[in-house]
């Protein structure tokens, strides 16, 4: 399901595969808040921040339908291993059931590029994993190109 937010902004719902502009895109939102002790439930923190087991199973079923092959992966956080390599086990970014699911995807999914945005900085981690924060990219045949940083 796609929810239209504005004429140029769309919400790709969790655990689904989309065909957009010739790209097969898998989207899986969610991340664990590392600062939830400072947040208020229902105002700045929601229990639904992590996908349910049913949502993860629907995601697996959607990937089965495309033989575990997509062009682009869009997530908020990254796999347990990459998160560990980025932050060297900092307590604020701990392993959880979602990062473990992303680890499973990283090891088994055939994909070209994986974009995430949870970590509040932009960086190309390796040839396939890209963290985006204040950067907009355009997909190209060979991968992607940075268009411009978002002005603050």
What are these regions (language model features)?
Residues 80-151:
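Conserved beta-sheet core of the metallophosphoesterase superfamily
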Residues 4-9, 65-71, 104-113:
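A structural motif corresponding to the C-terminal end of an alpha-helix
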Residues 12-13, 57-62, 99-103:
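A generic local structural motif
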Residues 3, 14-21, 124-126:
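Short acidic-hydrophobic surface loop/beta-edge motif
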Residues 8-13, 131-132:
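A conserved beta-strand/loop element that lines the FAD pocket in flavoprotein oxidoreductases
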Residues 15-16, 29-32, 77-78, 117-119, ...:
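Active-site metal-binding loops of divalent metal-dependent hydrolases
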Residues 7, 20-96:
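Active-site-proximal loop/helix segment associated with metal-binding centers of metalloenzymes
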């Amino acid at each position: 399901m796609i929810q239209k937010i504005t004429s140029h902004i769309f919400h790709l719902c969790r655990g689904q595969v989309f065909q957009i502009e010739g790209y097969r895109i898998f989207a899986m939102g969610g991340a664990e808040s590392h600062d939830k002790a400072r947040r208020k439930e229902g105002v700045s923190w929601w229990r639904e921040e992590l996908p349910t087991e049913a949502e993860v199973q629907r995601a697996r079923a959607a990937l089965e339908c495309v033989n575990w092959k997509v062009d682009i992966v869009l997530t908020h956080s990254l796999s347990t291993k990459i998160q560990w390599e980025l932050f060297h086990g900092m307590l604020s970014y701990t392993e959880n059931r979602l990062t473990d699911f992303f680890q499973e995807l990283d090891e088994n999914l055939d994909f070209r590029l994986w974009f995430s945005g949870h970590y509040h900085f932009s960086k190309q981690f390796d040839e396939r994993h890209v963290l985006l924060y204040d950067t907009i990219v355009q997909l190209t045949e060979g991968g992607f190109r940075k268009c411009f940083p978002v002005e603050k």
